[in-house]
A protein has these predicted regions:
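Mid/C-terminal beta-alpha module of Rossmann-like enzyme folds, strongest
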Residues: 54, 61-107
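Short, glycine/charged-enriched secondary-structure capping and boundary segments
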Residues: 17-23, 52-53, 82-84, 111
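NAD(P)-dependent short-chain dehydrogenase/reductase
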Residues: 1-43, 50
């Protein structure tokens, strides 16, 4: 008997051991490095602070089920990078476009449509990516 919790594309303001996708995008843009972002793929970014609150609830209210603790919306990596640039006043012209097919060429394939939803999560309102970025701005 166990709880299985699935998360998707976690991101946060600080974690020095490993950069997540948000901090990687932000770092590239801050250092004026161009990025080629996928336009025809979807991801579900999840703010780690929300995951922590959701896990606390699940630990205190055990039920042997599968839960998805994921962000409130999904978007393309291109749109995610555009939002990072917008929220942190970085240069959007550094963000180029590519397709999923072109990006995974000669690489290990990634899921093209990672559109996971929190159907059973009626205990904690997960943030959208834009709301998560607003909170990160306050934390930085």
């Amino acid at each position: 008997q166990a709880i299985i919790v699935r998360i998707s594309y976690p991101y946060r303001a600080h974690f020095e051991l490993k950069k997540d996708f948000f901090r990687t995008f932000k770092s590239y843009l801050e250092n004026k490095k161009p990025l080629s972002m996928i336009t025809d793929s979807l991801m579900t970014p999840t703010f780690i602070d929300d995951i922590a609150f959701g896990l606390k609830y699940l630990f205190n209210n055990f039920s042997p089920e599968i839960f998805h603790l994921v962000g409130a919306n999904f978007l393309s990596p291109y749109n995610a990078c555009q939002l990072v640039a917008e929220k942190f006043n970085l240069d959007k012209s550094l963000i180029g476009k590519t397709t999923y097919k072109e990006y995974v060429k000669n690489k290990a394939k990634l899921p093209q449509f990672a559109t996971i939803k929190s159907k059973k999560n009626n205990f904690y309102k997960m943030r959208t990516f834009e709301q998560g970025l607003e909170e990160i701005k306050k934390q930085l």
